[in-house]
Amino acid sequence: GKYAEYYTPRAIAQVMARLLVGDEANLRGVTCYDPSAGTGTLLMALAHQIGEDRCTIFSQDISEKSSEMLRLNLILNNLSGSLPNVVQGNTLTEPYHKEENGSLRKFDFVVSNPPFNLDFSDFRDTLASDTVRFWAGVPSVPAKKKDSMSIYLCFIQHLINSLKTNGKGAIVIPTGFITAKSGVERKVLTKIVDNRWVYGCISMPSNVFANTGTNVSVLFFDKAASAEKVILIDASKLGEEYKEGKNKKRRLLKDDIDLIVNTFKNKEAVEDFSVAVSYDEIKEKGYSLSAGQYFDIKIDYVDITEEEFNNRMANYKAELSRQFAESHRLEEEIMKQLDALHFNVNVGNNE
């Protein structure tokens, strides 16, 4: 419906929550934050995975309407204690949740499905001047198409800044980012690999979001940089197609979610689906987080005995000889028919 812009598909929210928290986690007193919370789909999935009585929710979103819906969501999900932490405002220019000394508050879990592209030319320079917070820089203002400014790059940096030293986070981003070759995109990508913050990337099927045709991926961060290998998954072929009005959409089914979660947790290599690679391997591949670039190219060789080889060659030769003979016969037949043709002066004469 019309609130699609505030909504993350539940399946993606489940994948993010299960992978960040685990399926048998026994956590207490943890903090969860979303800097672009919308109506709270990601936060609700996270709270449900942890246990609503074991966590506190913090959020900020520029939309008053979605913040109101998030408050309602908290009440319906036994999270009323977190109501004072739902804030309407611009997270990038005026982050609300701070420590007493004025620095950004740090959380155990941070999740985000931020806007990808937005005209933020009016406060771009303000952000760019804060080089500590935006360590990889801020996209410049283009001469045309200001609404194509990649604001999500600011949210990636803000998310990482908002994690405790052992905190974990996940963010939905356009898939183009994971093979970025230049600009702020490239600086963010190299930093999250060099610092070993990113430990997983899942590329989702096309058309999983109601409001965008953009292909999306989910990045997973561990501020403790404890992973030895990064798990990369190409889930683009999963899910089932359905129609929403005139639009074709795709949704992940329960089996798809389980496959993604189990493959990710076990860091399994599955042909044409997933691969676990070291940070050095990622650097060798030009910092690509695209699973497909690491898949082996397979050439199938068939083992045969010398006798089988000789039999096959004899059959090929016999077949070729037969075809040559047939060709020669046809050639002679055509030549005979051509020889039999004579010029007839009376053809076409009515007399």
Give each language-model segment a name.
Residues L104-E351:
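A conserved structural/catalytic subdomain of Rossmann-like adenosyl-cofactor enzymes
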Residues K2-S112, N117-S121, D125-A128, I173-G176, ...:
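Conserved S-adenosyl-L-methionine
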